Amino acid sequence: MQFGRICSFLDPGFEKGVPLGKVTVFAGESGAGKSYFAAGNIVKSAQDQGIFVVLIDTENALDEAWLQALKVDTSPEKLLKLSMSMIDDVAKTISTFMIDYKAMADEERPKVLFVIDSLGMMLTPTDVDQFNKGDMKGDMGRKPKALISL
């Protein structure tokens, strides 16, 4: 099943929508409209098809009024909005959710869509530790490894 018809000029592969059961990433410059696109099109379309949405906001940018203006149903029956910034927290949350989800009988399992806005803003424990110590040199390999394991 696919949802959220996307303009084919973005990518011909999305002409039929975003496929369920797959990881889809939207990349672009800051301010390009990725959050608007994900919330206004993908989340709304998923909800219209009865899909429960878990929206993980790492930027604290997706407030309820903005989502409602995009016609996203923010009621707890349709949307679980979480604010977190650590990659480890996101991974643990998804893992815990999936354990509980798999424990349900097949006929009771709702379709679920996870949206993470934004991968680029997530932090590793080392990022926080270095920031607290005033060490801003960074380590380019740490974050990609953590994201791959996510």
What do the PLM-derived regions correspond to, one by one?
Residues 93-150:
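P-loop NTPase motor core
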